[in-house]
Design a protein with these regions (language model features):
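An amphipathic, basic-hydrophobic alpha-helix
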Residues: 63-85
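An aromatic- and histidine-rich active-site surface loop
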Residues: 86-105
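N-terminal subdomain of nucleotide-sugar transferases
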Residues: 2-45
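Active-site-proximal region of nucleotide-activated glycan assembly enzymes
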Residues: 107-156
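Residues at the starts of beta-strands that form the adenosine-phosphate
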Residues: 9, 34-38, 53, 108, ...
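Structural motif
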Residues: 9, 85-86
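Short hydrophobic segments within beta-strands
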Residues: 12-13, 39, 89, 112, ...
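Conserved nucleotide-sugar phosphate-binding/catalytic loop shared by glycosyltransferases and other
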Residues: 14, 34-71, 141, 148-153
Length: 156
């Protein structure tokens, strides 16, 4: 009999821009050991993930928070289709919503706060502490009992 080995699936989520660039720095090395499925707020991000599966999610922020409701249905549909073992995100608001919905479906979740946040955690990062399974900062000075430091995207 043959044994089919299935890789654990990671859903990697970020808004377009700096959050997306940081996510790719973190997740590209994981593609050797895991099935990484990407999700971002702009379809052009698909061109940056090679042959990995890609989903586009609705974008929103605190300035147009009403979009959070339709975005929730969009994200939940993707979560139920993909059924990842874990979700990793670098933000921003759509990544936080994905973590909240992921926890509701029993998925392990990882928030990595942006390297741009040197003095304090981002607003979404502070909220992520209440929902995410694991929360990371990229600055040792921001580490706490709840927020871990494990290096940064520059390899420091």
């Amino acid at each position: 009999s043959t044994v089919i080995m299935t890789q654990k699936k990671i859903l990697a989520v970020a808004s377009i821009g700096g959050h997306w660039v940081q996510l790719l720095r973190i997740t590209h090395p994981l593609e050797e050991r895991y099935e990484v499925v990407y999700m971002s707020t702009h379809p052009k991000c698909k061109s940056m993930v090679g042959n990995c599966r890609f989903h586009t999610m609705m974008d929103f922020s605190r300035w147009n928070a009403w979009k959070m409701l339709p975005a929730s249905f969009n994200i939940l549909g993707i979560l139920l289709k993909e059924r990842p073992a874990a979700i990793v995100t670098t933000g921003a608001a759509p990544g936080l919503l994905t973590i909240i919905l992921g926890r509701m479906t029993g998925t392990k979740t990882i928030w990595v706060d942006s390297v741009a946040n040197v003095q304090t955690m981002s607003t979404c990062g502070k909220l992520a502490r209440k929902f995410a399974t694991h929360v990371y900062t990229q600055w040792p000075g921001l580490a706490t009992a709840q927020v871990h430091y494990a290096g940064n995207i520059f390899g420091d």
